A protein has these predicted regions:
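Extreme C-terminal disordered tails of eukaryotic proteins encode short linear targeting/docking signals used
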Residues: 779-792
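C-terminal interaction modules of eukaryotic adaptor/scaffold proteins
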Residues: 719-782
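Residue-level detector of beta-propeller blades
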Residues: 629-630, 741
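Structured, soluble regulatory/oligomerization domains located on the cytosolic or IMS-facing side
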Residues: 700-703, 707-726
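Glycine-rich beta-to-alpha transition loops that act as phosphate-gripper elements at the mouths
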Residues: 619, 708-711, 732-733
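Alpha-helical transmembrane segments and immediately membrane-proximal extracytoplasmic
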Residues: 2-624, 630-647, 651-687, 693-702, ...
C-alpha cells in the first residue's frame, strides 16, 4: 500500500549511516512500509506502483460478462493477433532504421578518419574522430537527460520489473520511445562501448505498450474496440511480445527472441502467449530479411548486409568447424574463465554505477560532464592504442593497398599491403569487430599482444560506458569481450588445441554471456541463430551451463544486480530461507484502513486524502450483517470513479433492488489508465451536503479477493503472491472472535529491506548461510581441478 515518499533522510537506518557510501543502496526504503516506494527508472528517481493483474469480480463485472456477445469475443481475439502483426512490422522497421543509421553515421565517420590517416594527417584525424564522438554522445545524453530520463540505460531491468508487476512513470511513453531510438543511434555511433540489443528490447516493449494503451483521448483514439486492452493483464502480454520482438530485431533470431522473453523477462507465461510471441518474431525476421535484400544492391549507403551482427559460419571452412573429445577440457576451461570474468565484470559494474550515481544526482550539467569525460577517454583509448600494435602484412593484397582477403580491416598508419589488427577491432563498430573475431580460417591474422590489449580495453570500457546517461546496451559489448578472450585463450593454447580460433571466439562469447547475464537456453539459441551452425550447439550448451553454474556462486546476474541497485522491488521465483521462519502475521504492519459496506462520503474522502493506500477491505457490520464479516476489497481507483459519478444515497442503506448498475455505469468507466498514470483525489470536489451522504460499495467491491490465514508461512505466501500476480493479499485471523481482517500484504512486504528491518535478528543467519554456500562451491571446484590434474 502506498502514498507519497518521505524525505530521504528519514529512510536511512543507523546501520546504513555507518556503512561506506559506495556500499549503500542508491535509494533507501522504509522499514515500516506504509509509504510509497521510489526507484531509479532510467536515470531518474521516480515513484513506483504495482500492477493489478487480478480480475475484479463484482456485480458490474458479472453483468458486463453476461451481456458480452460472441462477436465481441471474436473481435477481441482478432484484435490481439492484429496487434501482434503490427508490433512485428513496426519493430522490424525500427530495428532496420536503427542499424541503417548507425552503419551510415559511424561508417561516414570512420571513412573520414581513414582518409585523413592515409594522407598522414594524424592529428587532424584524431580531432575529427574525438570531436565527432563527443558531439554524438553529448547529443544522446542531452536529449535523454532533458526529454526522457526513463530512456537511459538498456531498459531491460525496467522491462523485467514491469513484467514482474512493477509500474513506473514514462517507461513506455512515446517520448521514451523516440529518445530511445534517436539516443541509441547517437550513442552507438559515438564509438562508446555500448550496444543496440538492450535498447531494442525496450523499444519493442514501448511499441507494444503504445498499442496496449487502449486508445487516447488526447489524440482522439477513443474507439470502443480499443478499450479491450485497458487492463494490466493484456498490456503485460503485449509488452512481453514486444520485448521478444526487440531481441529478434537486434539479432535476426526469432526463436531466440521468444526464449529470451520467456527465460529472462517474463514472470508469468502461458502456452497461448508462446504462439503469439513466435508469430510476432517471425514477422520481424521476414521484415528484416526484406530490407536486407533491398539494401544488398547498395541502395542504403554503407549498410549492405551489416548492422545485424549476423555471421554465417556454416558454409565457410566447414572442415575447421569440427571438434573432438580431447577438446572438451578446453571448453570447460573457457566456461570457468568466462564465469570468473563475468562475475568480476558484474561486481565492477555495480561499483562504477554507484560512483556515477553520486555524479549524476548533482544535476544535468554533471551528467553531461560525465558523458564528455567518458567520451574523451574512449576516443583516446580507441585511437591511441593501435599506435603500439605492429603492422602485419596482408595475406592477399587488394586494391589501394588494402587487404583483399580480410573484411573491414584497417590499414591505419601502416604502409600499403599491411594492416593494423588492433585498429581493425578498435576503429570499427562492434558488429564488424564481432564478425572479424568470429571469422574462421584466420588463426594467424591477430597478434596475441593485440588480443590482450583489446580484451583489457573492451573489458574496462564496457564497465565504464554503461552508466552514462544515454540509451545503451550490454549484450553486444559482452559478446565482443567474450569473443576477444576466446581468441586469446586459443592463441595461448597453441598446438594443444585443434579448435579453430573463430570457433573458440564464439565459445568465449557464450561463456562471458553466461557469466554475466546468467541465461542459458535463450543465449544458446541466439548464438546458434547468429552463426547459422548447429554443429556448435553441444559445445555452446556445455560452456553456458558451466559458466552460469560457476558464476552463480559469486553474485547474481547483471540485470538482477542493476534492478536491486535501482531499487526496483522485483519478486524472485524462490523464497529466501529466512522467510520460512516467519508467518505472514509477523510482517503485516498497520494501521489498517477499512470501509463499511455502506460508507459515508465524507469518511471516504478523508481516508483517500490522508492515505495513499490503493485498496481497502470492505467489512459488513450490523445492520447489514449479524457480526462483522469481510465482504471484499475495493480499489482506490474505483472509489474515485464513484465519487465523480456522485451516485450517493441520502441514508445509510443499500441500493434498492430496482437500481440498475448497468444503466448508470459502464465497464469502461473503471478501465485502468495507461502505464505510470494514476488518478488523484485532488480533482474531486464535493459540496458539504454531498459529504454527509452515503455510497453503497457492495456492487463495486471485489467479493472474492485472495486471502491467507495469518499463520501461513511467508515463503508460501510469496509463492502464491508471485504466481497469481497479485497486488494485494488479504490476511485473515485464525480465530473467529477477532476483526475479520488482520492486514493486507503488498509487494513491498516481501522485500528483504522490510522483513529484515522488522526482524534484524535474521540478518546474521542470512549472510552466514551465503558465506557457507560460497565456501562449499569453492571447495568443490578445487577438488574438481585436482582430480582433472591427476587424470591428466
Amino acid at each position: 500500500m502506498a502514498s507519497t515518499a518521505p524525505p530521504r533522510e528519514d529512510l536511512i537506518t543507523e546501520d546504513e549511516e555507518q556503512r561506506p557510501p559506495l556500499t549503500r543502496p542508491l535509494l533507501h526504503r522504509s522499514a515500516t512500509n506504509n509509504i510509497s516506494q521510489v526507484a531509479m527508472v532510467g536515470s531518474k528517481a521516480c515513484p513506483i506502483e504495482s500492477l493489478d493483474y487480478e480480475i475484479i469480480e463484482n456485480d458490474l463485472f458479472d453483468q458486463n460478462w453476461r451481456t458480452r456477445a460472441k462477436a465481441d469475443q471474436v473481435r477481441y481475439v482478432v484484435l490481439k493477433w492484429t496487434f501482434c502483426f503490427a508490433i512485428g512490422i513496426i519493430t522490424g522497421v525500427v530495428g532496420f532504421l536503427i542499424n541503417l543509421a548507425v552503419e551510415n553515421v559511424a561508417g561516414f565517420k570512420h571513412a573520414a578518419v581513414s582518409s585523413l590517416m592515409d594522407s598522414s594527417s594524424y592529428w587532424t584525424a584524431f580531432w575529427v574522430f574525438a570531436g565527432a564522438n563527443l558531439a554524438l554522445l553529448l547529443f544522446a545524453s542531452a536529449i535523454t537527460a532533458s526529454v526522457s530520463p526513463a530512456a537511459g540505460g538498456s531498459g531491460i531491468p525496467e522491462v523485467k520489473a514491469y513484467l514482474n508487476g512493477v509500474d513506473a512513470p514514462n517507461i513506455f511513453s512515446l517520448r521514451t520511445f523516440a529518445v530511445k531510438v534517436i539516443g541509441n543511434i547517437a550513442a552507438v555511433s559515438s564509438s562508446l562501448h555500448v550496444g543496440k540489443a538492450g535498447p531494442m528490447v525496450h523499444t519493442g516493449a514501448c511499441i507494444a505498450a503504445i498499442f496496449g494503451q487502449g486508445g487516447s483521448r488526447r489524440y482522439g483514439l477513443t474507439w470502443r474496440w480499443l478499450r479491450y486492452f485497458k487492463n494490466d493483464r493484456d498490456r503485460r502480454d503485449l509488452v512481453t511480445i514486444g520485448a521478444g520482438a526487440g531481441v529478434s530485431a537486434a539479432f535476426r533470431a526469432p526463436v531466440g527472441g521468444v526464449l529470451f522473453a520467456l527465460e529472462s523477462l517474463s514472470s508469468w507465461w502461458r502456452s497461448a502467449l508462446i504462439w503469439r510471441s513466435f508469430f510476432t518474431t517471425a514477422v520481424v525476421a521476414v521484415v528484416l530479411r526484406l530490407f536486407v535484400e533491398l539494401c544488398g544492391t547498395g541502395r542504403c549507403g554503407m549498410f549492405g548486409k551489416g548492422g545485424l551482427i549476423m555471421y554465417d559460419v556454416s558454409t565457410l571452412f566447414e572442415d575447421l568447424m569440427t571438434y573432438h573429445l580431447k577438446d572438451i577440457p578446453i571448453v570447460v576451461l573457457i566456461g570457468v574463465i568466462g564465469a570468473v570474468l563475468g562475475a568480476f565484470y558484474n561486481f565492477l559494474m555495480m561499483q562504477v554505477l554507484r560512483v556515477y550515481s553520486v555524479v549524476n544526482e548533482r544535476g544535468r550539467a554533471h551528467k553531461l560532464l560525465l558523458a564528455a569525460a567518458v567520451s574523451v577517454l574512449t576516443s583516446c583509448c580507441v585511437f591511441g592504442m593501435p599506435w603500439f600494435a605492429p603492422c602485419r602484412p596482408c595475406p592477399v593484397a587488394g586494391p589501394n593497398g588494402a587487404c583483399g582477403s580480410l573484411n573491414k580491416f584497417r590499414r591505419f598508419h601502416c604502409p600499403p599491403d599491411h594492416y593494423n589488427d588492433l585498429a581493425s577491432l578498435m576503429l570499427n563498430i562492434n558488429d564488424d569487430a564481432i564478425r572479424n573475431l568470429y571469422a574462421t580460417g584466420t588463426n594467424d591474422v591477430y597478434h596475441p599482444g593485440s588480443m590482450l590489449a583489446f580484451f583489457l580495453a573492451s573489458y574496462a570500457l564496457g564497465v565504464l560506458s554503461y552508466g552514462v546517461v544515454a540509451p545503451s546496451g550490454l549484450f553486444v559489448p559482452i559478446i565482443l569481450t567474450g569473443a576477444t578472450y576466446g581468441r586469446l585463450v586459443a592463441m595461448l593454447l597453441g598446438r594443444h588445441s585443434g579448435l579453430d580460433h573463430g570457433l573458440v571466439a564464439i565459445l568465449g562469447s557464450a561463456s562471458f554471456l553466461g557469466g554475466t547475464l546468467r541465461m542459458t537456453v535463450s543465449v544458446c539459441v541466439i548464438i546458434v541463430e547468429l552463426t547459422n551452425n548447429l554443429l556448435l550447439l553441444p559445445l555452446v550448451m556445455l560452456v553456458l551451463l558451466i559458466s552460469k553454474t560457476v558464476a552463480d556462486s559469486f553474485n547474481a546476474s547483471i540485470y538482477d544486480l542493476i534492478m536491486r541497485l535501482k531499487g526496483l522491488p522485483y519478486l524472485d521465483g524462490h523464497a529466501e530461507p529466512y522467510m520460512r521462519q516467519l508467518s505472514v502475521g509477523d510482517v503485516v504492519v498497520g494501521p489498517l484502513r477499512s470501509f463499511n459496506g455502506v460508507e459515508k462520503v465524507g469518511h471516504i474522502m478523508h481516508v483517500l486524502r490522508t492515505t495513499g493506500h490503493h485498496a481497502f477491505p470492505v467489512i459488513d457490520e450490523p445492520p447489514f450483517a449479524t457480526a462483522p464479516v469481510l465482504y471484499g476489497l475495493v480499489l482506490r481507483a474505483h472509489l474515485l470513479v464513484l465519487l465523480r459519478k456522485r451516485e450517493f444515497l441520502p441514508a445509510q442503506e443499500r441500493y434498492p433492488k430496482e437500481y440498475s448498475i448497468a444503466a448508470r455505469f459502464e465497464a469502461q468507466d473503471f478501465d485502468k489508465r495507461g502505464s505510470g498514470k494514476q488518478d488523484t483525489v485532488d480533482g474531486v470536489e464535493l459540496s458539504p451536503e454531498e459529504m454527509e451522504m452515503y455510497v453503497d460499495l457492495h456492487p463495486f467491491t471485489n467479493a472474492s479477493p485472495y486471502t491467507v490465514v495469518e499463520t501461513m508461512s511467508l515463503a508460501k505466501a510469496l509463492v502464491l503472491f508471485r504466481e497469481v500476480g497479485l497486488r494485494h493479499l488479504l490476511v485473515v485471523p485464525k480465530a473467529c472472535d477477532r476483526s475479520p481482517v488482520v492486514g493486507i500484504l503488498t509487494r513491498h512486504d516481501f522485500m528483504p529491506e522490510h522483513i529484515l528491518g522488522l526482524h534484524p535478528v535474521l540478518l546474521g543467519g542470512k549472510w552466514k548461510r551465503l558465506r557457507w554456500h560460497k565456501a562449499a562451491v569453492a571447495k568443490y571446484f578445487r577438488d574438481l581441478i585436482v582430480r582433472l590434474a591427476n587424470c591428466g
